[in-house]
Curated annotation (Swiss-Prot):
SUPFAM superfamilies: Ribonuclease H-like (SSF53098). GO terms for biological process: DNA integration; DNA recombination; transposition. Transmembrane segments: none annotated. This is Putative transposase for insertion sequence element IS986/IS6110. It holds the Pfam family HTH_21. It comes from the Bacteria. Involved in the transposition of the insertion sequence. Keywords: DNA recombination, DNA-binding, Transposable element, Transposition. GO terms for molecular function: DNA binding. Residues 101-268 form the Integrase catalytic domain.
């Protein structure tokens, strides 16, 4: 059906509606939040972030506008196992038995390592994570998958807690899979010096250290795969430092009640410092 010229020009010259103006503003905020969080947030986390910032908006509106913008979240793939067991080395008992929900910080630390392909060869990455709030306490990037790398990661974890005046680590269980780096004499001696109890998965399945592998999977999905190709180990190290800071302080983690790990830890300690009611 033909459209009268006056109707056409009225349409293109009309003032935008309030909804259109609001949508335009929200699109800018949505794009900003999505980009600031490594492009990994879906509509739910973008919506939560906007509301945390004081920008009140319905989740369905965020979903609608993200569709228009062509934005979506990421889905974590299946992680590959990296550690290799040493059958000749004695292993500590499994003190965790796949229970990864401790009642407080500094009860269970989990550790694992993964690798990143670069133009200069493989970069190996080790993480130490406190299971209570899924906070990464220590990490290290190295060119070899050696005991020194996991030692550096545990040293950083110990140092992190020392900066927070946590000096007594006797209640900490350090849980890993059967990788030879974690069952070496040097590593076992360092845990003993710190008063940390070692634990190694009993069965040898990925489920034995599922939380640590989850952290590795998020790292690969949120940072490594979107950032390919990686030119050097140094590039991986710098990017990992930024990602860990974001992960701990800004990333909304569903397990933590959709707050960052550091925020959940702070809430735990604040609750303990409150005087009892009555």
């Amino acid at each position: 059906m033909p459209i009268a010229p006056s109707t056409y020009y009225d349409h293109i010259n009309r003032e935008p509606s309030r909804r259109e103006l609001r949508d335009g503003e929200l699109k800018e905020h949505i794009s900003r939040v999505h980009a600031a969080n490594y492009g990994v947030y879906g509509a739910r986390k973008v919506w939560l972030t906007l509301n945390r910032e004081g920008i009140e908006v319905a989740r369905c509106t965020v979903e609608r506008l993200m569709t228009k913008l062509g934005l979506s979240g990421t889905t974590r793939g299946k992680a590959r196992r990296t550690t290799i067991a040493d059958p000749a080395t004695a292993r500590p008992a499994d003190l965790v038995q796949r229970r990864f929900g401790p009642p407080a910080p500094n009860r269970l630390w989990v550790a694992d390592l993964t690798y990143v392909s670069t133009w200069a060869g493989f970069a190996y990455v080790a993480f130490v994570t406190d299971a209570y709030a899924r906070r990464i306490l220590g990490w290290r990037v190295a060119s070899t998958m050696a005991t020194s790398m996991v030692l550096d990661a545990i040293e950083q974890a110990i140092w992190t807690r020392q900066q927070e005046s946590v000096l007594d680590l006797k209640d900490v269980i350090h849980h890993t899979d059967r990788g030879s780096q974690y069952t070496s004499i040097r590593f076992s001696e360092r845990l003993a010096e710190a008063g940390i109890q070692p634990s190694v998965g009993a069965v040898g399945s990925s489920y034995d250290n599922a939380l640590a592998e989850t952290i590795n999977g998020l790292y690969k999905t949120e940072l490594i795969k979107p950032g390919k190709p990686w030119r050097s180990i140094e590039d991986v190290e710098l990017a990992t430092a930024r990602w860990v800071d974001w992960f701990n302080h800004r990333r909304l983690y569903q397990y933590c009640g959709d707050v960052p790990p550091v925020e959940l830890e702070a809430a735990y300690y604040a609750q303990r410092q409150r005087p009892a009611a009555g």
